[in-house]
């Protein structure tokens, strides 16, 4: 960590290690110890949630589950998989008077402050040092980018805030292989002046730390990579 690192989220509860037995659907995981866990992430997470992999869970009483998956092991470190906390983390990097869940035309963007619209994206996939988003096709994500472009052209400041939920990424790129339409919209957004800020995070014990900002990969807009 660096001298500029700081805590951006505290789970404030013990985290228990377990092992995935089965992912029975997008949102429910059964562990080897027999626990039924809620997985709050719309992505595929196939590189993280698979039988035999290590996960971190905590007690969380739901309608069908008593636990929640918070992180999974990548082989080199923990990756936070709880997407419900993304906007709470994002607030650490925004003014205190920011407005949340702002309706704009046919979309709802995450934040607004001082003539600035902000959309937050959480990234859990890293391949060969590249943080990649999305890990599953996202029409909603593409629509958000198109809205940010329109707002930029209308004179607003538009910002994409990317939270990389692990600390082993060197740079970020849209995931052309998984979602070419989103990636093209991301490229268009940057070319139209939409700003991109990428935060590298790390889970230590039961706290998430901000480590540093990273940049777009040099080949981020290369369709073939």
From Swiss-Prot:
Domain of life, per lineage: Archaea
- Matches recorded under InterPro entries: SfsA, SfsA_C, SfsA_N
Q: What GO annotations for molecular function exist for this entry?
A: DNA binding
Q: Which NCBIfam families match?
A: sfsA
Under the heading PANTHER family, the entry gives: SUGAR FERMENTATION STIMULATION PROTEIN A
Q: Member of which family?
A: Belongs to the SfsA family.
Protein name listed in UniProt: Sugar fermentation stimulation protein homolog
> Which organism encodes this protein?
Sulfolobus acidocaldarius (strain ATCC 33909 / DSM 639 / JCM 8929 / NBRC 15157 / NCIMB 11770)
């Amino acid at each position: 960590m660096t001298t500029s690192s700081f805590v951006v989220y505290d789970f404030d509860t013990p985290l228990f290690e377990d092992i995935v037995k089965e992912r029975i659907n997008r949102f429910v995981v059964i562990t080897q110890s027999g626990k039924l866990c809620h997985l709050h992430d719309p992505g595929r997470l196939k590189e993280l949630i698979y039988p035999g992999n290590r996960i971190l869970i905590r007690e969380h009483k739901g309608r069908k589950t008593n636990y929640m998956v918070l992180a999974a092991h990548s082989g080199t470190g923990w990756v936070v998989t709880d997407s419900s906390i993304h906007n709470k983390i994002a607030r650490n990097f925004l003014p205190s008077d920011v407005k949340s869940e702002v309706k704009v035309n046919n979309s709802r963007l995450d934040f607004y402050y001082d003539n600035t619209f902000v959309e937050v994206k959480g990234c859990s996939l890293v391949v060969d040092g590249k943080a990649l988003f999305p890990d599953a096709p996202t029409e909603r994500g593409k629509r958000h980018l198109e809205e940010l472009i329109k707002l930029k052209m209308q004179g607003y400041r538009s910002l994409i805030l990317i939270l990389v939920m692990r600390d082993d990424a060197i740079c970020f790129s849209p995931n052309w292989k998984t979602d070419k339409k989103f990636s093209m919209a991301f490229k268009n957004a940057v070319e139209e002046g939409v700003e991109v800020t990428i935060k590298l995070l790390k889970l230590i014990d039961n706290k998430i730390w901000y480590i540093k900002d990273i940049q777009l990969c040099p080949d981020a807009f290369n369709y073939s990579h």
